[in-house]
């Protein structure tokens, strides 16, 4: 997605670009409960690979864990989506794909962005049984939550903002969320300085 931002001050456009990378929340696997893993991959490597799978993100029905009213480490139906991954090879080598990750309960639109992402290969007799906990997070905490890439460039005397999604959200939704975040931060900054001004006026009176 490419947007003409020639009429927007560069520092505002750059702020939006930074929010795309750092602040727009997306959903990814945060925790993996290993029930059984006899695959060639260690628990740590398998968990890491799963955490990098983009999940279609529902920003309208889920909260960031730190903002959820449950305030529980385990989470609730408003801040965590539980998935399971059960796979076993019997008489031949199989490849386990992201399509094999199934929701434990109804997950709405939340699902792996693509079903064709390979997770692990299993030889006959090997199996994996896992529980996955998918939560909202931000790119500034870990790159697995980075919504996409964003860059500013100039061409033919005009300035453009280019956004490419990793699959969590559509580019247009990413842009809308980034703009909302910039607006909110500006509002918070204004409130902060207004309080400082008010406090200074009271001290000088």
Give the predicted meaning of each segment.
Residues 1-205:
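Protein-protein interaction/assembly regions in multi-subunit complexes
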